[in-house]
């Protein structure tokens, strides 16, 4: 994947627009973009087309990675790579990977609730610092299993991917409609031991119905009092998180 991105003849630090739904392919393209020293910019296919166009207009040059199904959804004049093309053998010799903390890691957009969405660029240095903090503050073992639920345009999705990859435990997920049909059943089927849920979804899960949980994290809105009672009583562990997109991910945990 990364070799194909390098062959696009774009500069280090240019954008790779990942126009894919939550899937293993999305995670692979994200990691390939970083290996190729490109900037990951998620384009959630569920967002309105006008918003996707606006995001591309703000960020500028780059390559769109998408599928045959989504290829014609965005009518902008940028190079495109189809997912099936990334999976083809590459004739070029492997390139030398030289990681740099100075290269931007990703660009995410704010919700735009107070005006137009704003693009926020975060460096690998800032992301690495966040991961180091999570390692210190969050309990985990090699048997931990973190739920990946957040949509790719939200910074929580990067928390859900980078934490297990960096610390050496498992991430588990399923199509969002399946997860939300019966969240507790999904926790049991996937053997989830830790999760970061929006306040509204945190209210739908009860510790007595789940596998033994290491912690439940929630933020972004006021958590229901019942959730605090159920999850804030040992041996349960409730973590309240807050952090704007501009501050990397989860600036405060309590």
Place the predicted regions along the sequence by residue.
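Alpha-helix capping/helix-boundary segments
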Residues: 47, 69-71, 178, 200-202, ...
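Gly/Ser/Thr-rich phosphate-binding loop
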Residues: 166-171, 193-196, 202-254
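Short acidic active-site motifs
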Residues: 50-51, 179-183, 226-227
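Conserved coil-to-alpha-helix start sites within the AMP-binding
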Residues: 20-31, 46-50, 149-167, 181, ...
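Conserved acidic residues
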Residues: 53, 62, 144, 193, ...
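Conserved S/T- and glycine-rich ATP-binding loop of Class I adenylate-forming
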Residues: 16, 33, 64, 104, ...
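Conserved AMP-binding/adenylation subdomain of ANL enzymes
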Residues: 118-147, 154-193, 252-254
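Carrier-protein-dependent adenylate-forming modules in NRPS/ANL systems
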Residues: 1-128, 138-139, 168
